[in-house]
Amino acid sequence: MKAILLVLLCAFAATNADTLCIGYHANNSTDTVDTVLEKNVTVTHSVNLLEDSHNGKLCRLGGIAPLQLGKCNIAGXXLGNPECDLLLTVSSWSYIVETSNSDNGTCYPGDFIDYEELREQLSSVSSFEKFEIFPKTSSWPNHETTRGVTAACPYAGASSFYRNLLWLVKKENSYPKLSKSYVNNKGKEVLVLWGVHHPPTSTDQQSLYQNADAYVSVGSSKYDRRFTPEIAARPKVRGQAGRMNYYWTLLEPGDTITFEATGNLVAPRYAFALNRGSESGIITSDAPVHDCDTKCQTPHGAINSSLPFQNIHPVTIGECPKYVKSTKLRMVTGLRNIPSIQSRGLFGAIAGFIEGGWTGLIDGWYGYHHQNGQGSGYAADQKSTQNAIDGITNKVNSVIEKMNTQFTVVGKEFNNLERRIKNLNKKVDDGFLDVWTYNAEMLVLLENERTLDFHDSNVKNLYEKARSQLRNNAKEIGNGCFEFYHKCDDACMESVRNGTYDYPKYSEESKLNREEIDGVKLESMMVYQILAIYSTVASSLVLLVSLGAISFWMCSNGSLQCRICI
C-alpha cells in the first residue's frame, strides 16, 4: 500500500509541474517539395519557380500586334504572292506568325536561294518601309512590263504575278541590254529581291527575251553574281515547265546595287528599308490572334509570369522565363509541416521539434508553449522568426534574380540539304536544355535541403537558449520540453523566452523540490526491490510445493516408482 501511495505521489507531482516546450509552426498546407535526400516533403510554405500555364492566345507584344501571315509564308509575303495581298499594308509587327498550313510562298515554281538565311534576318526585323525601288512606269521604257504574268500566280481568276517584282520581257521583238542602279539613301539596310527565269526550251527563250545568249548580272560592294539561263526540259509544276529562281541581298546605307541584263531578269519593283527589333521573331502557331497584351509569347499561347522557369514551349519571343523540361520546381520558404496528433495529450504529441509542429502557433515560425498555474498558451519568438524570414526571402529573391534572365528563343533555319546540320544542332540544343534543366533542379534541391536544415538549426538554437538559462532548475523530458522544479508563473515564462531568466532566484526552491522528488523516487525504488525479492521467494516455494504434491500423487497410484537405496 505504501508503494502504491508513493507511485501516486510521483505521478501527482509530475502532473502539477509547470512545463515549457520549444516548437515550431504547423498548418494545413499540402505543399510538397523535393530535397537532395527526400521527395515530397510536406512544408508549411513554398514558392513555385516553374510556370506551366498560358492563355492559348497570340497577343500584342509591347503594345504592337503580331504579323499573322495566315495561309502565306515569309516567301509569299516578301515576294508579294497575289494570295497575300492582305499583307501589303502591314508595315510593323512585334513578331511574325506562320501557321501549319502557310503554303502560299513561291507561286511560280523554282528555288528561293538562301531562304533560311532570309528568314533568320527577318526574325529580327520589327518594321519596314516599303518603297518603289524602280518605278514601273519610268524605269524600263525599252522593255515590256505588263505581259509578265502567269497562270501559276492567279488573282481573281486571271493570270497575275508577284506584286513586288516585275517580269521584264522583250518589246517589239527587241530586248536591249539594260542597266539600272539604286543608291541606298534610307540610312538603314534595304532588302532587295529579284529573280532569274529559266525557260524550258530555246523557243520560249526567244519568244520571251529574243536573245539566245542572255545573262543577268547583279553587283554591289558586298554582292556580285552573274547568272545565265539554264534551258532544259522539266516536268510541269503548277502547269509550268519553266523555273524561276529567287535571290535577295541586304544593301548597306550608302551602297549602290546595279542590275545589268540582256534577258531573263525578274526585276525588283519594291524594296524594304528594315528596322531591327531585338524582341521580334518568327513562330509557327495555329493559335488565334486576340485583343490582349503580353510580355512573353510562345506558339502555344502568351505567358504572363515573373517566374524564372517555364515548361510550356522552348520557342519564346519577348521577356520570357527560361525553358526547362522539369515538371516541378518548388522552393521551400517555410518549415516541415508535421502537425501534432492532439489526441495524444498536450505535451505528449505536440512535443516541439521532436514529434511535430503546432497549429496553434500562428504568429511566428518558432516559439514556445507553456503550462502553469495561470493557464497555458503559445508565444512566438519574433526575433528568430523575423531573421529567418529575412534570410529566406533574400535567398529566394537572389535565386530568382540570378535565374530570371529573360530570353527570346527562336528556331534556327535550315534547308532540306542541311538536315545533318539541323539534326546536329538539335542534339546540341537538347544537350544545353538538359544541362539547364539539371542545373535548375539541382539548385532547387540543394536550396530546399539547406532551408529545412536552417529551420531545424533555429529550433535547436532556441532550445539550447532555454536549456542554458534553466540549467538544473528544470528537467529535460526528452521531447523538446522542460519540466520546472519550481513554480513558474507567466512572468517567469516570459523571462525564459526573452532571455532574462533569473536562475539564482529559483535555484533554492528547485533544489528542495528536486531533492524531495529524488527521495520519493529512491524510497519507491527500495519498496519495489523488496516486493520483487518477496515475489521471487514466494513463487519459488509455490513451485516446489506443487512439484512435491504431483510426485507424491504419482507414486501412490503407481505411475511413478520411487526407490530409496541405502
UniProtKB/Swiss-Prot annotation:
**Keywords from the UniProt entry:** Clathrin- and caveolin-independent endocytosis of virus by host, Clathrin-mediated endocytosis of virus by host, Disulfide bond, Fusion of virus membrane with host endosomal membrane, Fusion of virus membrane with host membrane, Glycoprotein, Hemagglutinin, Host cell membrane, Host membrane, Host-virus interaction, Lipoprotein, Membrane, Palmitate, Signal, Transmembrane, Transmembrane helix, Viral attachment to host cell, Viral envelope protein, Viral penetration into host cytoplasm, Virion, Virus endocytosis by host, Virus entry into host cell
Cytoplasm among the record's keywords? no
Locate the transmembrane regions by residue number.
Answer: 530-550
A molecular function (GO) term: host cell surface receptor binding
| InterPro entries linked to this entry | Capsid_hemagglutn, Hemagglutn_HA1_a/b_dom_sf, Hemagglutn_influenz_A, Hemagglutn_influenz_A/B
Sites where a glycan is attached: 27-28, 40, 104, 304, 498
Q: Which domain of life is it from?
A: Viruses
Q: How does it sit in the membrane?
A: Single-pass type I membrane protein
All disulfide bonds of the chain are 21-481, 59-292, 72-84, 107-153, 296-320, 488-492
Q: Name one GO cellular component term.
A: virion membrane
Record note on modification:
Palmitoylated.
Where does the record place the S-palmitoyl cysteine lipid attachment? 555, 562, 565
Q: Which residues lie on this side of the membrane: Cytoplasmic?
A: 551-566
Q: What does this protein do?
A: Binds to sialic acid-containing receptors on the cell surface, bringing about the attachment of the virus particle to the cell. This attachment induces virion internalization either through clathrin-dependent endocytosis or through clathrin- and caveolin-independent pathway. Plays a major role in the determination of host range restriction and virulence. Class I viral fusion protein. Responsible for penetration of the virus into the cell cytoplasm by mediating the fusion of the membrane of the endocytosed virus particle with the endosomal membrane.
Q: Which HAMAP family match?
A: INFV_HEMA (MF_04072)
| Other comments on record | Major glycoprotein, comprises over 80% of the envelope proteins present in virus particle.
Subunit annotation: Homotrimer of disulfide-linked HA1-HA2. Interacts with human CACNA1C.
Family designation: Belongs to the influenza viruses hemagglutinin family.
Name under which the protein is recorded: Hemagglutinin
Protein source organism: Influenza A virus (strain A/Swine/Iowa/15/1930 H1N1)
What gene is this protein a product of? HA
